[in-house]
Amino acid sequence: MSAEIICVGTELLLGDILNGNAQYLAQQLAQLGIPHYHQTVVGDNPDRIKQVIKIAISRANILIFTGGLGPTPDDLTCETIADFFGSPLVESPAIIEDITQKFAQRGRVMTPSNRKQALIPQGADILPNPTGTAPGIIWEPRPNMTIFTFPGVPSEMHRMWEETAVPFLKSQGWGQEIIYSRSLKFWGIGESALAEKVTAYLNLPNPTVAPYAGKGEVRLRVSAKAPSEAAAEALIAPVEKQIKDIAGLDFYGVNNDSLASVVGELLRSSGETLSVAESCTGGLLGQMLTEISGSSDYFWGGVISYDNSVKAGLLGVNSEDLEKLGAVSDTVAEQMAMGVKTRLSTTWGLSITGIAGPDGGTETKPVGLVYIGLAGPGDEVSSFKYNFGTMRVGLRPTVGDRSFIRHLSACTALDLLRRRLLTR
């Protein structure tokens, strides 16, 4: 037994709308312990929807459709499913009454086109929609086959799933075991290098371990199948500990942890403070830090020193060094870090100066060249050189990708501070 998610909507194929429904349903299926191996997105075309159904029923017993339940001519999900299985559509008086009442509550009269939403395959049960006009169905068109349909509006679909589909599936015996996962996060190591280090864990049966790439980072998903979350965590815990020991400082957090949140907790626990000076990242580092609730406990503030006059005037960077070495240099990065630390009276100062591109690079200072400065207690200061323009993420080079170079710069600065706090 397995489930397949089928999301209907040309707007999804065109990329006009992010397909959050598939992500939500995949997570929900895991919580119920229902195997799920395929997802499909298909446009509002009956022939192509039928092709998708033909493939899906050859490999899954539970088909979950989202989208295509509205009143317009291109909303074809229910009628196409019924036609595929050779079932007539019947009008549901209960749905007509529900839609009529909802229109009346809004001071409107139901339009003739909305009657289309009351047509369901003969023998199907209604999935009530508490907020919208598009109900769903639960239907068993043949033995060992269950079909669910939901509207594409996420808020409506979520509520209908939780209030009707989940109880139904549990009544069928699902939910006795769950699939529970923890995402281990790593920075400063590539996916292949990490996979090589943890090769012995990649073929475990339960829990399973699988690497995947995040935005500039690498993650390992450790998943266990067990009767409860606590039982799954007990299976995962020893494997997680062993992987952390192998990865060392390259491991930084789990699940919803971010580099900013981890650094914040380290600063808070030590009673220390941080300030930042940014050039090419233009405030991104400060934004990451202040996205964390309570960051005012340790983050004093920052200076966006985009122009050299600000570097010299507000941070005290030597004008001769700016003229001779340029703003993108180790010396300037160190002076920026020390300058912001001194002026804001913090324990630590972080600085970033570089060439984010896509223009502005030279042969000696190419796009992606970044210097990060770190000033610590007393007169401690150091700088680190990176060339993010030579990196690749999957098949995509970062050179010329201004947004991604800035992201890598800010995250790497946080990672440098994290490692320093852990190893002093």
From Swiss-Prot:
Covalent S-S links between cysteines: none
InterPro entries documented for this protein: CinA (IPR050101), CinA-like_C (IPR036653), CinA_C (IPR008136), CinA_KH (IPR041424), Competence-induced_CinA (IPR008135), MoaB/Mog-like_dom_sf (IPR036425), MoaB/Mog_dom (IPR001453)
SUPFAM superfamilies to which the protein is assigned, alphabetical: CinA-like (SSF142433), Molybdenum cofactor biosynthesis proteins (SSF53218)
Pfam families: CinA (PF02464), CinA_KH (PF18146), MoCF_biosynth (PF00994)
HAMAP family: CinA_B
Family: Belongs to the CinA family.
Family matches, as PANTHER family: NICOTINAMIDE-NUCLEOTIDE AMIDOHYDROLASE PNCC (PTHR13939), NMN AMIDOHYDROLASE-LIKE PROTEIN YFAY (PTHR13939:SF0)
Name this protein carries in UniProt: CinA-like protein
Originating organism: Nostoc sp. (strain PCC 7120 / SAG 25.82 / UTEX 2576)
Lineage summary: Bacteria, Bacillati, Cyanobacteriota, Cyanophyceae, Nostocales
